[in-house]
Structures are given as structure tokens and as C-alpha cells.
Amino acid sequence: MKVRASVKKICQKCKVIKRNGVLRVVCDVKKHKQRQG
């Protein structure tokens, strides 16, 4: 899980979703997990 100021899709499978007011990136590739903070 990376915590970043700006979250971006890294690959085609990445999805940007908003969960409890927090932007997150979920993906099959575990390395690509991110959240905004």
C-alpha cells in the first residue's frame, strides 16, 4: 500500500474508487495498491 498525494492508475487493471471519502487504487497486482493521504 502506497500513500500518495496523487493517485494514478499504473496499469490497465487498476481501478480508482472512492471509499469513505478516500481515493483508492485497487488492482490485481498487489504492488499497485494506493491510497490518497
Curated annotation (Swiss-Prot):
Note the superkingdom of the native organism: Bacteria
What the entry lists under SUPFAM superfamilies is as follows: Ribosomal protein L36
Give me any GO biological process, just one. translation
One GO cellular-component annotation of the UniProt record comes to: ribonucleoprotein complex
Keywords of this protein's UniProt record, alphabetized?
A: Ribonucleoprotein, Ribosomal protein
* UniProt GO molecular function: structural constituent of ribosome
**Any one Pfam family match given in the protein's UniProt record, by short name:** Ribosomal_L36
Q: Where are the transmembrane segments?
A: none
Q: Does the keyword Ribosomal protein apply?
A: yes
Recorded hits in PROSITE patterns, A to Z, give: RIBOSOMAL_L36 (PS00828)
Matching entries from NCBIfam families are given as: rpmJ_bact
Q: Which family does it belong to?
A: Belongs to the bacterial ribosomal protein bL36 family.
Q: What is this protein called?
A: Large ribosomal subunit protein bL36
